[in-house]
């Protein structure tokens, strides 16, 4: 049920978000405590401001009120995915190629579940990072999450 809501909302709001010149990065529909949250993550070159979030929130809220794809009450949140956003799409992997990433796997590989290295890319569902001069490959379905590592 939750996945269907995410897919339905994605299909519904994606054209609106794109028409406002933003990228729809992800949608989450989660329960926290007694409340449900619909989180819409957007991005654009140069980053996202509060005004950007407000503009998208107003349009998406109006659309969701009209089409009403969710039965129960929920809170709508629109935000940036953050600097350490998870990489999910082929576009994400292409965009952040050459950057430092952290790969977390479901099952340990040689006793490790977390790997850090430079993102080489994603091809044929194989994620490749360069770790200390050696390419390390991961089957995409073995990977729990890939996210950027931000060094300050």
Curated annotation (Swiss-Prot):
<dbReference type="GO" id="GO:0005829">
    <property type="term" value="C:cytosol"/>
</dbReference>
<comment type="similarity">
    <text>Belongs to the RimP family.</text>
</comment>
<dbReference type="Pfam" id="PF17384">
    <property type="entry name" value="DUF150_C"/>
</dbReference>
<keyword id="KW-0690">Ribosome biogenesis</keyword>
<dbReference type="InterPro" id="IPR028998">
    <property type="entry name" value="RimP_C"/>
</dbReference>
<dbReference type="GO" id="GO:0006412">
    <property type="term" value="P:translation"/>
</dbReference>
<comment type="function">
    <text>Required for maturation of 30S ribosomal subunits.</text>
</comment>
<protein>
    <recommendedName>
        <fullName>Ribosome maturation factor RimP</fullName>
    </recommendedName>
</protein>
<dbReference type="InterPro" id="IPR003728">
    <property type="entry name" value="Ribosome_maturation_RimP"/>
</dbReference>
<keyword id="KW-0963">Cytoplasm</keyword>
<dbReference type="InterPro" id="IPR036847">
    <property type="entry name" value="RimP_C_sf"/>
</dbReference>
<dbReference type="Pfam" id="PF02576">
    <property type="entry name" value="RimP_N"/>
</dbReference>
<dbReference type="InterPro" id="IPR035956">
    <property type="entry name" value="RimP_N_sf"/>
</dbReference>
<dbReference type="GO" id="GO:0000028">
    <property type="term" value="P:ribosomal small subunit assembly"/>
</dbReference>
<dbReference type="InterPro" id="IPR028989">
    <property type="entry name" value="RimP_N"/>
</dbReference>
């Amino acid at each position: 049920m939750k996945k269907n809501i995410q897919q339905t909302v994605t299909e519904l709001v994606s054209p609106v978000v794109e028409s406002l010149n933003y990228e729809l990065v992800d949608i989450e529909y989660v329960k926290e405590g007694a409340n449900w949250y619909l989180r819409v993550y957007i991005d654009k070159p140069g980053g996202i401001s509060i005004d950007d979030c407000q503009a998208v929130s107003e349009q998406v809220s109006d659309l969701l009120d009209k089409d009403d794809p969710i039965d129960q009450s929920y809170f709508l949140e629109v935000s940036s995915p953050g600097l350490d956003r998870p990489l999910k799409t082929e576009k994400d992997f292409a965009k952040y190629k050459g950057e430092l990433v952290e790969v977390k796997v479901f099952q340990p590989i040689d006793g490790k579940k977390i790997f850090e290295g430079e993102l080489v890319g994603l091809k044929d569902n194989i994620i490749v990072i360069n770790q200390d001069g050696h390419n390390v490959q991961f089957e995409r379905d073995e990977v729990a999450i890939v996210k950027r590592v931000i060094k300050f």
